[in-house]
Structure formats: C-alpha cells, structure tokens
Amino acid sequence: MAEAFLQVLLENLTSFIGDKLVLIFGFEKECEKLSSVFSTIQAVLQDAQEKQLKDKAIENWLQKLNSAAYEVDDILGECKNEAIRFEQSRLGFYHPGIINFRHKIGRRMKEIMEKLDAISEERRKFHFLEKITERQAAAATRETGFVLTEPKVYGRDKEEDEIVKILINNVNVAEELPVFPIIGMGGLGKTTLAQMIFNDERVTKHFNPKIWVCVSDDFDEKRLIKTIIGNIERSSPHVEDLASFQKKLQELLNGKRYLLVLDDVWNDDLEKWAKLRAVLTVGARGASILATTRLEKVGSIMGTLQPYHLSNLSPHDSLLLFMQRAFGQQKEANPNLVAIGKEIVKKCGGVPLAAKTLGGLLRFKREESEWEHVRDNEIWSLPQDESSILPALRLSYHHLPLDLRQCFAYCAVFPKDTKMIKENLITLWMAHGFLLSKGNLELEDVGNEVWNELYLRSFFQEIEAKSGNTYFKIHDLIHDLATSLFSASASCGNIREINVKDYKHTVSIGFAAVVSSYSPSLLKKFVSLRVLNLSYSKLEQLPSSIGDLLHLRYLDLSCNNFRSLPERLCKLQNLQTLDVHNCYSLNCLPKQTSKLSSLRHLVVDGCPLTSTPPRIGLLTCLKTLGFFIVGSKKGYQLGELKNLNLCGSISITHLERVKNDTDAEANLSAKANLQSLSMSWDNDGPNRYESKEVKVLEALKPHPNLKYLEIIAFGGFRFPSWINHSVLEKVISVRIKSCKNCLCLPPFGELPCLENLELQNGSAEVEYVEEDDVHSRFSTRRSFPSLKKLRIWFFRSLKGLMKEEGEEKFPMLEEMAILYCPLFVFPTLSSVKKLEVHGNTNTRGLSSISNLSTLTSLRIGANYRATSLPEEMFTSLTNLEFLSFFDFKNLKDLPTSLTSLNALKRLQIESCDSLESFPEQGLEGLTSLTQLFVKYCKMLKCLPEGLQHLTALTNLGVSGCPEVEKRCDKEIGEDWHKIAHIPNLDIH
C-alpha cells in the first residue's frame, strides 16, 4: 500500500512545487526536500512490502512512514485551500491571515521533516534492496472490450451432472426435507458449481420456484426469510415481525417443489438452523435445499444427504483455466512460456481461484524472466491458514502496477459479500487520491481503466450491469488478501474515512473507521477526513461544523430525514461527491452550492427538491447532476447547463418555464458522455404554447451517444426532427408519455439499436405506431430491426403497428403489451413470445392474437364488455405454455379452441365474475398441463370434465369459487374423482 500512496503524494508535491502559488507560502525548499526524501524511500518500498510479511519491525516502520505521508498530504491540502481563498479574496502577501498561516504551516513542515529524517535513517538498518516497479504496458495481443460474463468453467461438468441427478432422482423418495451440502475450501468454486446446477435446464424444469440466497456470516432467521420471500415475489415484503414473515413464506412454499440454494454458509449453531428448517418443511415432496460451505461441521449439522466434497481441479483443467486467463484468445502461445506455466500451475494446487489469479497477472507479460519470477518467488513458501491461498493471491497483488495496488486494497473497507457499484467505488478512489492523472483523461476515466484492469486480473467477479451501473463482488479469499494488506497501516492515527454503520460484522480497516452511531463530536475528532458516510443514520439535522472538514471530498448523506442542509457545507472547497439521494424530506439545497468548486457528482435522486440551486453552471467540474428544475429567474434557467460536461443521466423538468428556443440553449448536443435524458413539462403549467414548445424541444437535440430517451407531457403538435437514425443511432430505449397534441409518432422504426419502446397516453389522432415511409427521410425494409420489447398504453384510436405488414418488420420483437387500445389489431409477427393485453379490445383485435403463432405466454384481461371470446383466437397458438385470463367481468364461457393448446403448461383464470363453465368437451386436449389455478370466479359451477385424464397435472388451486369448492370436498365431493390424482391441491 505504501509505495502506491507515495507515488500519488510525489505527483502532488511536484505539482505543488511547480505552481506559482507556492511563492505565497515560501515552502519551495521544504517541498523539494520532502520530495527528495520520499523518492529515496520509495526506491526500497517494494522490498519492504515483501519483507514486512516476516518482520514485525519492518511492518512498524511502514506504519510510521504511512503516518508521515498522510500528514504531508494534509499539509498540501490545506495549502491548496488557503491558495484558493487567497485568490478569491485578493489579499496581499503581508495580510495578517496569510502571515499567520505561513507561520503555522512552517512549524508543521519542520516537525514533519524531523520525523521523515528519523524514518529515513531507520531504513538503513533493514538493508533494503532498491527495486523499481515499472508499470507494465499491455501486450499487443490483449483482448479488447470487457465482457460481463463469467469465463468458461473448466472441469466441473461431471460434478454438475452428478448433483443434478441426485437432486432430481434421489430426493423424490425422501420423507424429510432433503438438504444437500457442497463442502470445500475457499476458492474451489463451490458457488460457481452451485450456479451451474441452479441454471441447469433439468433443474429449471423440475423445480419451481428456484431461490438463491447468499447467507455469508449473518445467519439471521428473519433476514434469510425476508430475502427468500423477496426472491420469490420479486419485491420486498410489507411485514416486519418474524411471525408474519414465517407465515408469508409458508404460504408461498406450501405444496411447491422448490429448490433453495443457501450459498456460503458459516453458521454452525444447530438451534439456528433448526428454526429456519422448521419454516421450510411445507413444500411438496421433492423440494430440496442445496448448501455450500467451507466447514465440515456446517455440512454435518445441515445435511440430510451425504455431503459432496468438492475436489480440486485436475492438473489438465487447472492448466486450461490458467492458459485461458494468461493467453486469452491468442491461438499460438510461446512454448517456453507454456512450459513455465505448467510449473506455476502445480503451485496452484488445483484451486481454480489461484489459477485464474495467476493467469490474469501474467496476461500482460510475455518475457520468460517475468514468468520465471512468478514461478520462483519466495512468497509461495509462506505458511497458509486453514482455508487460505493468500500466498498465491499476495503474489498477484505484488505484480499489480502501482496505481492499481491501493485501489484494490481499499476494497477491504466493504464487508464480505457486498454487492459493490463500480461507479461509486471509483468516486471513493478519487476521494482518497488513489488515482494518478493520465494526460487529458478525466479521473473517472482513469478509475474505469483501473477497475477494468482489476477485473481482467480476476480480482472482481459476478459482474452485472443494471440501471446504468455496474455491480460486482469480490471473492472471499480476494477480500482476505485485501484485508491483510492493511496490517501495515492499521495503527495509523490519521483516520481518512468514517462509515457510520450498525452492521455487526463491519470492522475498521486501516485508515477507514467504522462507528456504530453518529454524534456531533465525531466531526471535531477526525479533522483529516476525506470520506464521511452518514447514510441511513436517521439524522434530521447536520451541524454547521461540517464546514470545518476542509479535506472532505466525499460526503454521503443519503437516506436521512434532513429538511435542509447548513450553508457552511459550501465551505468544503475539496468536496467532489455530495450524495443526498432518497432524503425524502429534503426540499432544498444550500443557496451557495455553486461555491463547491471541486464538486463532480451531485446525487439527488428521490429528493422532493422544488428548485435547483442557483448558478449551478459555475460548477465546471460537475459530471453528475441527476436532475435540473428549470426556473424563470436568472441563475435558474436552462442555460446553466450549457458549459457543464455532464455524464450518466439527467432529468430536466418544468420545461414549460422556458421562454423561447434561445433560452433553451443547454448545449446537449455537445454532451458526449450523457447516456440518459428525460425531458418533461408540467401538464398544469400556465401559458403553454404549442409552437413555442416545438422550438424548445428542437433546441434540446442530444448527442448521438445517447442511449435512453424520455419525453413527458410535451405540448407541441409534432415531435422534433432530431428523432431519426442519424442523431439517435445508439438509443436502445425510448419512452413517450402524455404527448397528447402530437398528431403522429416519430419514425422510431429507423432507429437501428432501439430495443425497448414504451408509448403511453397519446393523441386520439394516432392510428399507427409507424406511418408509411413516405414521411421518413430514411427508408429501410427492416423497420424496427432491433426492437425486443414494445409497450403501448391508452391510445384509443390505435389500429395497429404499421399500415403495411412485411416479413422484415419487427424481426426481433419478443415481448408486447397492448394496454387499453380497443381498436388494436395484431399483425403477423414471427418472433413474439410474450403478450399482455388489457382493456376492452374488440372482437377483431382478439381474433388477431392468433397471428402471433410463436407465443409462449399470454395474459389477457381487464375487459368489462366481452361476453365471449372468438373461437379463432387460439387456433394457431401451438407453442403457448402459459395462459392467464383475469378481470373479464361479463365473460360467461371459454372458447372450445382452448382445448387445442396441447403445449399449455399453466392455466390461470382469475376474477371472471360471470364465468359459469369450461368448454363442454372439458380440457382433455391440454395434455401438457401441469398447473391449473382458478380464483374468484363466483359463478363457476364445476371443474371441467376429463380433468382426471390429465396425467401431467401436478398442481391445482381453487379459491373464491364457492360452488366448485363444495364439489371438491375430499372423498365426498362431486368433483373429487376428477382431482384425486393431483399431488398438490390448494382448495380453500
């Protein structure tokens, strides 16, 4: 860690010495001496870092060095702040304030020089070797791009097949809930194997639902049950007490052949496990639990089946994995390197994580000497813990370039199993000054490069892109490595980061302290803070003393109860990130927010702000501004955005306040890093003029890099001309809502990358999503070439997608939702698999559903007019597997063509108040049906004939159907003979 921080500090010193403002303070000679001393020490740091693992005295020496380096960094920061104040106030060199500051800093400079002289002298007794750690350039053959998927899994197909067969076949005869533990040391790939099993097609067909829970250290019954419920329902449960959670989970699992994966279990308390297991025993026969753990004791406590001990990879598979990471897609590898690689792989001991890590670090090295150094390095011989491969991983760390080392080690600040957000981590790296400047690159771009390098070297895993962010995790062993790297700075007195958390298993790491609760004295005690995280602290007020934390660069106040923030917060000249998202009572930011001259990220999502702070355009470093509320007064107008180089997403609201197109000059077309843009008008705003709004929206033309576009309540009579293939060439999602005056829709069909289109509450004049190409400047046979999801709401005159059908139109469309469009008629489409239809669709529209012959899922309902459904509706739906009718208030019977759906697996009928009967011939044709659910059909008289012949039917649910429920009484009911063979009955 130390040499990486010194590299940053030396750059800061060099920059400070070269700045003319150093003359104000007269510290040029002192800074040059500091730089010289640090440079001398830096030359031996690599050797010191390696030797500290065996020598406590060296570890203590590094602690002293870290402490001194932090102190120098503080002094430089204070000088920078004073220089800014000097420039702004235009004080003279001999102003008492300047003289006093020079005297105070001069005294501290003298003290730190004495400390460093002692540290430099002490280093001589250790006889360190000078080693220059060079930054390695990537080889020319390095693969470009970065794929968000786990690389190929080697050597686990046999294990996957064996366990899948055990889960599916052996447990069918089990009387008690089967629990199958996978046991193995850390890094063997237990989680990866469990993921393979979880996603195996045989498992998916056999179990429903499938639930995955990462248990980790915290085996809390309430937390686990809540997580399981959330995974099943895809939302957080609205109950709080344990008993309600238990009842809810049992309702969800009752009679279900579910699979529950409990990953990374550490709990060896039999009583805790018994309590959770008791709640889970309500499933159908065949329901199973798969658990992964490092500990034999956990397996013996939990398991009802013989544990599966995961073995090491074979030498062959280990070599394949190592070579894949080391050489990528390179077809021909240097045979000498391959020979050395085979020797390195032997050291990995068949542990996949070690092979991946070492292969990753050699990916960018092609000299034999570099590979031999890895093979022969003495760190291999260090003793290991019970389940640790830290020597191998520590070697990987020491081969990282300097600018990656402390960035990686910093990840130890997060608890194990934390799902981290890449973009947030980069801002924290920036706050601590870990990122070295590179030419004209923004610091965020440098951080992105660092993150990608660490990912390619296998330090990060489980990558997932969602909602504009990249989520990832760190393997437990990698986390152990990062934690071990803080041993040399654990006693450092200069705390740089405070996290207020009440997590039981969160601990202080090095310069990052964790406290259980906030108190005002906290701010007075730690004056050198770079990062302060007060999120979820239930705070209603922030003390004005926050303005005294002059070094603060990252302030997280999210999810608190603030109504306002103190104006003194605006004294934080170094603040880069201010996060107040989801402060639901915060209706204003400080008026002097524009004085936060270093601010780069202002995160305000979920705050009911009534206005944007005035003169926001003065924040020329600003990259993130979640939204902008247009005002009519100077300092609040749209022009404030003109000179901001914004990234990510922005929502611009109250555009009705823009007076004319000149005032609409926000220079959006130059904002190449803006990914998502939302623009909205207030429907109730006064003095709205259609022609003015057309000009305003024309002036808000975005950059061609835009990917997400939303337009809400636009009052113009036509959409802007920039909605075309040349400007929106990269857009993948468009949402248009409540633009009721627009007589036709833009030519969305020509957008080459458009995957998701949502149209809501449009003009009564619109009859087709896309008119003839005669209105378009761009003609193509492949209209909507990439569209996958289409959702249309409340277009009462909409007749269809296009006037003219064609095979080359909508070739990729998979999901459709047509909601409350009564005249809509479906064209012939060959790729649609999922359809949802709501509202009083007319008979022609219902019949046209048969044009979608590839449908596998259909939900249709909220129709209060139809008394019957057309026979031809189902005639060609031979692939349909899921069918749901709901809220048909006047539907009396179902079409006989329903019985032709021989691929149907699940049929749901709900809230059809007038439904009296099933088709006369029953449901005998539904030979694949496994699940039938009928709810709240109060007029239904009986279950269909032939139900007893449906041998695949395993689940029947009936509720809110009084006549049917009587006829299903066990043994005595008139319909009992129809359902007696069904294993899972839920009739109440």
Curated annotation (Swiss-Prot):
Binding sites annotated in the UniProt record for ATP: G184, M185, G186, G187, L188, G189, K190, T191
Source organism, top-level taxon: Eukaryota
Domain NB-ARC: 137-439
Protein induction: Constitutively expressed.
Reported effect, S120A: In susceptible haplotype
UniProt entry keywords in alphabetical sequence: ATP-binding, Leucine-rich repeat, Nucleotide-binding, Plant defense, Repeat
SMART domains given in the database record: LRR_TYP
Family annotation (InterPro entries): Apaf_helical, Leu-rich_rpt, Leu-rich_rpt_typical-subtyp, LRR_dom_sf, LRR_R13L1-DRL21, LRR_R13L4/SHOC2-like, NB-ARC, P-loop_NTPase
LRR repeat positions: 526-548, 549-572, 574-595, 596-620, 638-662, 674-696, 751-776, 784-808, 829-851, 852-876, 878-900, 901-925, 927-950, 966-988
Biological process annotations from GO: defense response to other organism
Note: Belongs to a four-gene family located at the same locus. Although the four genes are expressed in the resistant haplotype, only RGA2 confers the resistance to P.infestans. In the susceptible haplotype, RGA1 and RGA3 are likely to be pseudogenes created by deletions and mutations, while RGA2 also contains several modifications.
Primary role: Disease resistance protein. Resistance proteins guard the plant against pathogens that contain an appropriate avirulence protein via a direct or indirect interaction with this avirulence protein. That triggers a defense system which restricts the pathogen growth.
PANTHER family, per database record: NB-ARC DOMAIN DISEASE RESISTANCE PROTEIN, PLANT BROAD-SPECTRUM MILDEW RESISTANCE PROTEIN RPW8
Membership in a protein family: Belongs to the disease resistance NB-LRR family.
Protein name: Putative disease resistance protein RGA4
Phylogenetic classification of the source organism: Eukaryota, Viridiplantae, Streptophyta, Embryophyta, Tracheophyta
